[in-house]
Amino acid sequence: MCLFTFLATGIFKFENYPKTMQLTSPYNRPAKLTVFIMAFAGSLCLAQSPSDFSVKTDKLLYQSTMDSAASVKDWVMEGPGHLKFADGWMEMRSPNEEMHHVYWCPETFPSDFMAQWEMQNQHLEAGLCIVFFAATGLESEDVMDSSLPKRDGVFSQYNNEALKNYHISYYANTPKLPARAVARLRKNPGKNIVYEGPPGINVESDRAHKVTLIKNKAHIRLFIDDRLIIDWIDDGKVNGGPLDAGKIALRQMQWTHFRYRNFKVWSLTSDN
């Protein structure tokens, strides 16, 4: 448990006030102290290291600060996603909420890896965030291979046609299904739901969160800060054995406006 979770739990128990009163009342002195301590402790959660997740990392394979166009110059956008760089962050959205979009990291990563990035919601009204990983063509082609069909952000192009991958929806607050109660891991092609866990990023949260994705052989885990929301072992019953090396992409639905920074991927040691 990181300090944020410990303090947040302890403060609310100690003060014995409803959470909504603590966070919204301008006349409640404990509320001001609570918000300050939670904000400080929350920033400490973002400083978590790989060892905090009971996994041994080997080499840092890739990193991008995501704070400038130069830092993501080789990334590939599919669909009408727009990027803006400010205050050390990369904001991503679709102007006028036109269409969904997918942003591919240029590197191909090994089967076993740990990825981390930070993100913060800029539009609390609606949105949905997905990470694709271990992504290749059906015959293990690179996802950017010119022989594969063109893609423009339409969901079926990523989960039902010419690609195989895993994907996790870890923030889900769409107009048709607001504040969805679960995070989902699917194995593609086929949109096969293989695991459902507790909700990911809280739909009311406007603070920065660290996302940690770990694929260790057949074992897949995803954390929001220090909170485990996906924990599944691929037994090969869906679409054959565990997927191998492939690319990672960040997907947003058309209503979504998040900002991102500090994307990193490590390989894992052989003794995990």
Listing of model-derived features with the role each one plays in the protein:
Residues 186-210:
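Short, aromatic/His-centered strand-loop micro-motif at the edge of beta-sheets
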Residues 66, 115-117, 207-216, 220-222:
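Short tryptophan-centered beta-strand motifs in secreted/extracellular beta-sheet-rich domains
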Residues 233-261:
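Flexible glycan-contacting loops in extracellular carbohydrate-active proteins
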Residues 34-43:
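Bacterial N-terminal signal peptides
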Residues 49-77:
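Extracellular carbohydrate-recognition regions
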Residues 96-183:
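Secretory/extracellular carbohydrate-interaction modules
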Residues 82-99:
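Short carbohydrate-recognition loop motifs
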Residues 22-35:
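Bacterial N-terminal signal peptides that target proteins for export
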